[in-house]
């Protein structure tokens, strides 16, 4: 049996070695027989290890007290050799003989289970233990009857017969014991074979479990790899779709490029023909360029000569321009009559007459006739006295219909003198409401026809400076705007917290030994365009001191001085020039009414009027002193004359606008203004000198 089991085990091992790897379901199917074999082995081990109930050899059956008593009774003794031997039941189930088990194992049907499973397992599983024989009472015997007779019970005194029976029974028990030992030995060998087979099957099971775990790991790896490959396939499919679209786009682009190439090839051929023609033209042009270079060199030489000549002509122009201005007079007076405003009474005919010039009606007027009626009557006829006629002659008279542009044309030559390096000062003088501020600054913003002298002069200077840059001249402009109120200098360009701090402004020399004057704490703003000047004028209008007077609802109560410092340089010739342009809007000149009742507001107006008249009187005295060539000129008697002293002397050019009202009710103030202007017009302050370096 051991050899056959070994061969079966080898066959089964070879079968397992050559068997393909099965799934988990097959492995579970293989485990079921193995578990049954294990259970049968445990049952067999229990049967083998169960204790035998056979009597030990050489031992004697002990009797109890009841049996001893029965043996003492003579009536119950049996005759020796006539009774049956009592059989001891071991109550041990007997299994089938080993030969039957082996035969059943060999001839039993072979199951379709996994290979390597022996048939011993089913045999042991289906074998049932034999039912134990019922225990017999002591003294009874189960031995068969002798000679066909039913054996009787030996009497108690037949000890020898009983002993023989016991020996016979012991012999039978020994034979049974030997038989059981042989069967036990066979079962032990069979158990050993089954255990070896179980060990082999366990080893194979472990091997299969390891193979199964390996297969599972490989399956998981394959699944992961499959998922990775699936994702890669999707990615590649998406990439393939993108590549296909790109290929389609490239094919479309290729077709377009082919068309463009065809077009470019055609154009290239045309360009080659044009290039050949251009080369021929270039050869011709080179010859022309050579000729033109020679001509250019000649033109450069001529241009330099023309530049020198132009510079000489510019210097001659300046000299003649200045000579013309001197012939007109370094102090000139223009009279301007403002038009009648809406709501004012129209003057009577003949009140203001503008006689034509010497050349006739086409000649601009230079005279003004003002008629003044007298309330006195003749003592003889008691008739009204004739009107008094006052004639005045000036350098130019502007009637009420004159436009701002006409006024500026007359002073544009004077503004040009400032650019040439001559100090220039232009005044606007007259009573309150006569149009001084309108003449200097203009009307409402946004209407170019109403622009005053200041914005027009700045536009003219910027334009001429731009033209002069072509001749090598560069100009810079620095503007300031101050007012003199009650002999106090205020900065009209102050902003923020500096507003109203005009008292801190003082007139000082620019430096030790310098004749140039400057105003401390005042803003000096570089300007280069008209918009910057407009912004400064708008700011000054907001800061200027105004008040209500008897002549005007909103009257300027201070002298405003717009100063523009002009600096020019010709770097190529090393020339420099500089001069100030002063545009002054004087405060209204009015006489005080002796019978005026003074209230709190009238006292302020009184002080303002006194300061204004004092400064205007000083201005007249300064002009007279300059005209008379006096050694002392009272510049310091007024802040106005002290600030303008460099523009009032013999090296300066001065022009005064006398503005008068067309109303008859203002005839007294108009006559006073005209008389003052006539005195100024009669003054001569000498020849002006340009400030050149």
From Swiss-Prot:
It holds the Pfam family Kinesin. ATP binds at residues 430-437. Signal peptide: none annotated. Residues 49-59, 127-138 have a biased composition (Low complexity). Residues 1-24, 48-156 are annotated as: Disordered. Residues 330-683 form the Kinesin motor domain. It is found in: Nucleus; Cytoplasm, Cytoskeleton, Microtubule organizing center, Centrosome; Cytoplasm, Cytoskeleton, Spindle; Early endosome. Residues 165-334 form a coiled coil. Belongs to the TRAFAC class myosin-kinesin ATPase superfamily. Kinesin family. NCD subfamily. Minus end-directed microtubule-dependent motor required for bipolar spindle formation. May contribute to movement of early endocytic vesicles. Regulates cilium formation and structure. This is Kinesin-like protein KIFC1.
């Amino acid at each position: 049996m051991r050899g056959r089991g070994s061969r079966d085990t080898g066959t089964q091992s070879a079968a397992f070695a050559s068997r393909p790897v099965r799934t988990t379901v097959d492995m579970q199917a293989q485990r079921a027989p193995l578990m049954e074999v294990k259970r049968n082995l445990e049952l067999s081990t229990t049967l083998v290890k169960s204790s035998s109930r056979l009597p030990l050899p050489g031992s004697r059956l002990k009797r109890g007290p009841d049996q001893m008593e029965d043996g003492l009774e003579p009536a119950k003794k049996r005759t020796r050799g006539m009774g049956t031997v009592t059989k001891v039941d071991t109550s041990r189930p007997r299994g089938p003989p080993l030969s039957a088990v082996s035969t059943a194992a060999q001839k039993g049907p072979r199951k379709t289970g996994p290979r390597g499973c022996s048939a011993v397992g089913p045999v042991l599983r289906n074998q049932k233990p034999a039912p134990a024989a019922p225990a017999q009472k002591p003294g009874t015997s189960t031995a068969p009857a002798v000679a066909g007779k039913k054996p009787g019970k030996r009497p108690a005194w037949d000890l020898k017969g009983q002993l023989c029976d016991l020996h016979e029974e012991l012999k039978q028990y020994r034979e049974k014991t030997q038989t059981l030992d042989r069967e036990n030995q066979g079962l032990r060998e069979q158990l050993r074979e089954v255990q070896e087979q179980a060990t082999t099957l366990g080893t194979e099971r472990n091997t299969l479990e390891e193979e199964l775990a390996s297969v599972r790991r490989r399956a998981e790896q394959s699944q992961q790899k499959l998922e990775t490959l699936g994702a890669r396939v999707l990615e590649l499919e998406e990439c393939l779709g993108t590549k296909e679209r790109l290929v389609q786009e490239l094919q479309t682009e290729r077709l377009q490029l082919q068309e463009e190439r065809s077009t470019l090839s055609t154009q290239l051929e045309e360009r080659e023909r044009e290039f050949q023609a251009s080369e021929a033209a270039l050869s011709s042009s080179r010859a022309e360029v050579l000729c033109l270079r020679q001509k250019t060199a000649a033109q450069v030489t001529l241009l330099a000569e023309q530049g020198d000549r132009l510079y000489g002509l510019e210097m001659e122009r300046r000299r003649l321009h200045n000579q013309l201005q001197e012939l007109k007079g370094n102090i000139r007076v223009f009279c301007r009559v403002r038009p009648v405003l809406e709501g004012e009474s129209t003057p009577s005919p003949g009140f203001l007459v503008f006689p034509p010039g010497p050349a006739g009606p086409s000649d601009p007027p230079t005279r003004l006739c003002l008629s003044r009626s007298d309330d006195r009557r003749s003592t003889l006829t008691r008739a009204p006295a004739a009107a008094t006629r006052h004639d005045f002659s000036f350098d130019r008279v502007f009637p009420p219909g004159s436009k701002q542009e006409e006024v500026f044309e007359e002073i544009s030559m004077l503004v040009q003198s400032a650019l040439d390096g001559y100090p220039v000062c232009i005044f606007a003088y007259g009573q309150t409401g006569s149009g001084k501020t309108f003449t200097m600054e203009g009307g409402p913003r946004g209407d170019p026809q109403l622009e005053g002298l200041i914005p027009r002069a700045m536009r003219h200077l910027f334009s001429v400076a731009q033209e002069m840059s072509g001749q090598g001249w560069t100009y810079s402009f620095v503007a300031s705007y101050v007012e003199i109120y009650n002999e106090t200098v205020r900065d009209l360009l102050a902003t923020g917290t500096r507003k109203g701090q005009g008292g801190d402004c003082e007139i000082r020399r620019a430096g030790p030994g310098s004749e140039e004057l400057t105003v401390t704490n005042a803003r000096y703003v570089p300007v280069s365009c008209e918009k910057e000047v407009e912004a400064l004028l708008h700011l000054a209008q907001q800061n200027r001191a105004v008040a209500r007077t008897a002549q005007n609802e909103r009257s300027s109560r201070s002298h405003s001085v717009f100063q523009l410092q002009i600096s020019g340089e010709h770097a190529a010739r090393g020339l420099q020039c500089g001069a100030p342009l002063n545009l002054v809007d004087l405060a209204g000149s009015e006489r005080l009414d002796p019978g005026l009742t003074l209230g709190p507001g009238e006292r302020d107006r009184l002080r303002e009027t006194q300061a204004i008249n004092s400064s205007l009187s000083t201005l007249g005295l300064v002009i007279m002193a300059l005209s008379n060539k006096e050694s002392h000129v009272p510049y310091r008697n007024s802040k106005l004359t002290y600030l303008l002293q460099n523009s009032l002397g013999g090296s300066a050019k001065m022009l005064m606008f006398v503005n008068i009202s067309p109303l008859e009710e203002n005839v007294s103030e108009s006559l006073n203004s005209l008389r003052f202007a006539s005195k100024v017009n009669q003054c001569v302050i000498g020849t002006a000198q340009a400030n050149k370096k």
